[in-house]
Each structure stands twice: as C-alpha cells, then as structure tokens.
C-alpha cells in the first residue's frame, strides 16, 4: 500500500500522511520515515539512469515546503559568498582585540633536577618550539 501511494505521490502532506498511517495501522512517524527512505532510494535510482524522472510533489502545497535542489544550490552559493566576505573583512569589534592581545603562554613539560623522572609544567611565552633532547 505504501509503495502504491509513493508511485502516485512522492511527498505527503500532513493530512495525507495521517490518513495513510491510520488506514495501515502505523504511526505518522513510521510513514514519514518510510517515505524519506523511499525517496532517497528513488533519487539514487534516478541518478543511476532509472526509468522514472523526478517529479514535483503533488497534493497540497505547504508554506514551508521542501526546497528544490536549485533553491538549495542557490542558498549554498549565497552562504559561501557571505562566508568569504566575512573572511576578507573581519568585523570591527574583533580588529581592536587582535592588536592588544598578548600571545597565549604554552605549557611545556620541563625536567627539574630536584625531582628526576617527574615533569613539571611551566608556562613558556616564546613562540619557538621546545628544544628536542
């Protein structure tokens, strides 16, 4: 029954999902999950040259419907442009902090003569790596 409905309609509205779940004795979550899994399987088949072509969802349109791949790509492109702009132009508030902050001290284990075999951690402020022994 789920497979028949899927062939007719790739996306279910909430009322359709509720009706189908009740008619099959399943929960809405079970039907929703089955449809999500089945759509993924269907999309893989389509991409590998299956016989069906992707179609737009039928039934009642929703205000917050699932975006198309074109909408997703456009949004990702917009987000990447915004991120690259932020990298080139850091916000005003952070610039002042960078100039005045001192480098953070690194904690490096140092051997101490009074306690052989035990390392004592001391802060080191120089940017050079610790000498290798």
From Swiss-Prot:
Q: Which residue intervals make up region (Disordered)?
A: 45-133
Molecular-function GO terms, alphabetical: DNA binding; DNA-binding transcription factor activity, RNA polymerase II-specific
UniProt keyword Zinc, yes or no? no
Q: Name one Pfam family in it.
A: Homeodomain
* Tissue specificity: Expressed in keratinizing epithelia such as wool follicle, tongue and esophagus. Expressed at low level in thymus. Not detected in spleen, skeletal muscle, brain, heart kidney, liver and lung.
Which is one Gene Ontology cellular component term of this protein?
nucleus
Assigned keywords, A-Z: DNA-binding, Homeobox, Nucleus, Transcription, Transcription regulation
Where is the protein localized? Nucleus
Q: Which InterPro entries match?
A: HD, HD_metazoa, Homeobox_CS, Homeobox_TF, Homeodomain-like_sf, HTH_motif
Which residue ranges carry the DNA-binding annotation?
1-46
Primary residence: nucleus
The record's function comment reads:
Transcription factor. Binds optimally to the DNA consensus sequence 5'-YYTAATGRTTTTY-3'. May control the expression of neural adhesion molecules such as L1 or Ng-CAM during embryonic development of both the central and peripherical nervous system. May be involved in controlling adhesive processes in keratinizing epithelia.
> What's the family?
Belongs to the BAR homeobox family.
The identity of this protein, by name, is Homeobox protein BarH-like 2
Q: What organism does this protein naturally occur in?
A: Ovis aries
């Amino acid at each position: 029954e789920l497979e028949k409905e899927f062939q007719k309609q790739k996306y279910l509205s909430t009322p359709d999902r509720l009706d189908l779940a009740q008619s099959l004795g399943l929960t809405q979550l079970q039907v929703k999950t089955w449809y999500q899994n089945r759509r993924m399987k269907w999309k893989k088949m389509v991409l590998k040259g299956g016989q069906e072509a992707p179609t737009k969802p039928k039934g009642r349109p929703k205000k917050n419907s699932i975006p198309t791949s074109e909408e997703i790509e456009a949004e990702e492109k917009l987000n990447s442009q915004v991120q690259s702009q932020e990298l080139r132009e850091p916000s005003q508030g952070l610039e002042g902090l960078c100039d005045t902050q001192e480098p953070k001290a690194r904690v490096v284990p140092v051997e101490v003569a009074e306690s052989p075999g035990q390392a004592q951690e001391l802060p080191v402020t120089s940017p050079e790596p610790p000498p290798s022994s």
